[in-house]
Amino acid sequence: MALPSSFLVALVALGCNSVCSLGCDLPQTHGLLNRRALTLLGQMRRLPASSCQKDRNDFAFPQDVFGGDQSHKAQALSVVHVTNQKIFHFFCTEASSSAAWNTTLLEEFCTGLDRQLTRLEACVLQEVEEGEAPLTNEDIHPEDSILRNYFQRLSLYLQEKKYSPCAWEIVRAEIMRSLYYSSTALQKRLRSEK
């Protein structure tokens, strides 16, 4: 069952406010940027979901990454950063050459994601300086590799389907669901830490 875009936007906004309260200096505009990104992603839909039913796939969204035991804010920042980084890759590099997205919406979406990544990277650097985050690739949180594998499955699916319009629609919807779930699960986890 697909949730309405406005409902998803509201839930992501709640999750983003929790990310903003992690203690690093993420500006208040971070929540607004996330809401806008989800709205744009919803507006980018090109096909009705019913026309792509035969192409649906279970990508095994790693729910435990967002609901697991992440006791450090560095881990939470890392998960959010990797998620945004991978979404940026899909829509701002891979999609730009193989999907017929509305150019105006795509540019605004990519610009907003780029701003989010810049702000998240500043927070990750702050955590490194405070000794809370890993300095080397060998120290990457296991959640990061789980997320990378999830996004790799999405990428392989697009390749297998030869970047068809339905494949892109399935991936776009999957990423919207991922943003929705990650935001609500992350918010719940952060509230339990208070």
Swiss-Prot record:
GO molecular function, one term: cytokine activity
Gene3D superfamilies attached to this UniProt entry: 1.20.1250.10
UniProt-annotated glycosylation sites, renumbered to this chain: N102
Stored InterPro entries: 4_helix_cytokine-like_core, Interferon_alpha/beta/delta
Disulphide linkage map: C24-C123, C52-C166
Secreted is among the record's keywords: yes
Alphabetical UniProt keywords: Antiviral defense, Cytokine, Disulfide bond, Glycoprotein, Pharmaceutical, Secreted, Signal
Compartments (UniProt record): Secreted
Signal peptide start-end: 1-23
Cellular component annotations (GO), alphabetically ordered: extracellular space
GO biological process, one term: humoral immune response
Family: Belongs to the alpha/beta interferon family.
UniProt-listed PANTHER family: INTERFERON ALPHA-5, TYPE I INTERFERON
Known role: Produced by macrophages, IFN-alpha have antiviral activities. Interferon stimulates the production of two enzymes: a protein kinase and an oligoadenylate synthetase.
Name of the protein: Interferon alpha
